[in-house]
């Protein structure tokens, strides 16, 4: 099946992939379970990485159990829908408790049940410059998105919140604020990159779990970018080419911090920084754009 790269559809003012927009209504009837764990991110912020870390924690670090199915089958993607592929809600029906779930939805579109049940959330935030570069490459290879156009026009659309899932700025801020009323562990991609063991220990504490030191070391090793890029259960190469074309750009491209410097021009960087300073003026947390 060839995808025609349909335009984004706005739901409550949030632009979404056309097929994903169709799930927002049905998702409102979704029933969360108290022992669910939600992984929330803006796209291209380490969702798959965190999904694999958490599945390894849930499986006690046993590699063969984590190889039971591709990551998107082990951690259902709530709003996912695509012709010819099981939807996120369909995958959920096959998922036994305790369930790991993932979403990129902003709070305004999140199923209310997740909030009512006080489902624990692990949120990963990544610096905007690396996100937008990664997102541009992802738009090019993932054909459910509209054509991204030129890099310069995509950058403008990102700053204006006119890309799938809307404003990065609003997303990272509203989930940060949710910490005051909801059990949210807010992590930074750059911190996990810098010291994965330290961050995994934070996750274990948040979940009220413990693992032997050697198991934690094994999780660090097997969730490294190199290992995950080689692993067909995590690198999305099992998705049909007509949906994701890895010849255009691999799903797991570089996984670094600071790669934006290879894409932004000096003028684009100045424009982005000025807009960022204005948009994030009320923000009480800081991102690192290089390590």
From Swiss-Prot:
Sulfotransferase that utilizes 3'-phospho-5'-adenylyl sulfate (PAPS) as sulfonate donor to catalyze the sulfate conjugation of a wide variety of acceptor molecules bearing a hydroxyl or an amine group. Sulfonation increases the water solubility of most compounds, and therefore their renal excretion, but it can also result in bioactivation to form active metabolites. Displays broad substrate specificity for small phenolic compounds. Plays an important roles in the sulfonation of endogenous molecules such as steroid hormones. It is found in: Cytoplasm. The keyword Transferase applies. The gene is Sult1a1. Substrate binds at residues 102-104. The active site is at 104 (proton acceptor). One of its GO terms (biological process) is flavonoid metabolic process. Homodimer. 3'-phosphoadenylyl sulfate binds at residues 44-49, 126, 134, 189, 223-228, 251-255. One of its GO terms (molecular function) is flavonol 3-sulfotransferase activity. It comes from the Eukaryota. It holds the Pfam family Sulfotransfer_1. GO terms for cellular component: cytoplasm. Liver, kidney, heart and colon. This is Sulfotransferase 1A1. The lineage of its organism: Eukaryota, Metazoa, Chordata, Craniata, Vertebrata.
């Amino acid at each position: 099946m060839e995808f025609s790269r349909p335009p984004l559809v706005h739901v409550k003012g949030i632009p979404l992939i056309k097929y994903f927009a169709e799930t927002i209504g049905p998702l409102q009837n979704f029933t969360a379970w108290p022992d669910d764990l939600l992984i929330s991110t803006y796209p291209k912020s380490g969702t798959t990485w965190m999904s694999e870390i958490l599945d390894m924690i849930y499986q006690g670090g046993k590699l063969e159990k984590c190889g039971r199915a591709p990551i998107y089958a082990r951690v259902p993607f709530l709003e996912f829908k695509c012709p010819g592929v099981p939807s996120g809600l369909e995958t959920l029906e096959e998922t036994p408790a305790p369930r790991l779930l993932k979403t990129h939805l902003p709070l305004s579109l999140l199923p209310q049940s997740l909030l009512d049940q006080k489902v624990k959330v692990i949120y990963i935030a990544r610096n905007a410059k690396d996100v937008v570069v990664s997102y541009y490459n992802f738009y090019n290879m993932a054909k459910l998105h509209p054509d991204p156009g030129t890099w310069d026009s995509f950058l403008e659309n990102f700053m204006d919140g006119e890309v799938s899932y809307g404003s990065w700025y609003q997303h990272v801020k509203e989930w940060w604020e949710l910490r005051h009323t909801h059990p949210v562990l807010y992590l930074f991609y750059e911190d996990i990159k810098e010291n994965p063991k330290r961050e995994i220990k934070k996750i274990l504490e948040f979940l009220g779990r413990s693992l032997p030191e050697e198991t934690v070391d094994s999780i660090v090793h097997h969730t490294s970018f190199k290992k995950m890029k080689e692993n067909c259960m995590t690198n999305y190469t099992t998705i049909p080419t007509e949906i994701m074309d890895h010849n255009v750009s691999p799903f797991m491209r570089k996984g670094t911090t600071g790669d934006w410097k290879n894409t932004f021009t000096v003028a684009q960087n100045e424009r982005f920084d000025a807009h960022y300073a204005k948009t994030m003026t009320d923000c009480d947390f800081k991102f690192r754009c290089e390590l």
